[in-house]
Amino acid sequence: LCRRNDVHRPAAVANAVSATTGAGTDRMVPDRTTENRDSVRSDLGTALENLCNAYDESALDPDPLVVVREFSDPRDQEIAAFFSALFAYGNARIIVRNLRDLFSRMPGGPYAFVTASHLSSGARCLTGWQHRLHTGEDVAIMSSILAHVLRKHGSLERVFCRGLRKGARDVGVALEAFVSFLREQERHEVEQRRFFRHLLPSPADGSACKRLNLFLRWVVRRESPDLGLWRTVSPSLLVLPLDTHVARICKQIGLTRRSTVDWKMAVEVTRKLRHFDPADPIRFDYALSRLGILGHCPLKTDINNCSRCPLHIACVIFRERGLS
């Protein structure tokens, strides 16, 4: 068996340690691999903090959260946040435009609309609304589902927390239970709608669940720009809302080597972010997502963009292309 200190070290380093300790001396050969790894981690931590400092609330627009913050009642904010996260795919400005259109069709605000909602009445109000794959019919079904939930449980937070287990590492299991519960509420209607399941992905299916994790970020985190509506879920349990754009950036700065954007990648990246902030690992998400939303980290490398980017000291692309 290997000594615990030798695990995951290159053979040359492990052999050097064995030879030194076997010669009857307490002197240890310096582990350059560990030193290098610590140096990289230090650079990345500095880069992430610089990135967070570069983007404050003034960089929020265009973002679906802008629309949510237009409501003042926490009950409206919770429902608006849920719908806004579900439809947070595609062009950011179009998302914001379509969300404002959607909420303008909800008399009395999102909470009042949903709690009074029935499939037929909801469908009438929402006729003609569409966002890419989804139409007003999908919103009507989801409103009916939420109506069942809110009448019985009072809030989405209470339903979500039923699946939260003591000692959980993250929200994964609770999110699975939450999605399963919602899918069951209007099962027949859900199964009839071709793209409805796209609105409610689950970690159990391997999905990264970017939009649901985004919803959780908004309602759980108490720091700007998020809402902090929920008080029974710890920010330390949140998982990074991972899409292809954020995943690409995470690869470039060494947070993952995985190729598939799925739940495993989201958990891995979150775990590494915990090294820099165990209590609030996804506080970096807002700033990371600005790079994609605002076009500050395009697919095509641009020396002017790269040299100004706070992440360049940790970016593999920046180093490999000799831009440093």
Regions flagged by a language model, labelled:
Residues C2, A14-V17, R27-S324:
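HhH-family (HhH-GPD) DNA N-glycosylase catalytic core used in base-excision repair
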Residues A11:
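Arg/Lys-rich RNA-binding interfaces used to dock onto structured RNA substrates
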Residues G22-G24:
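Residue-identity detector for glycine
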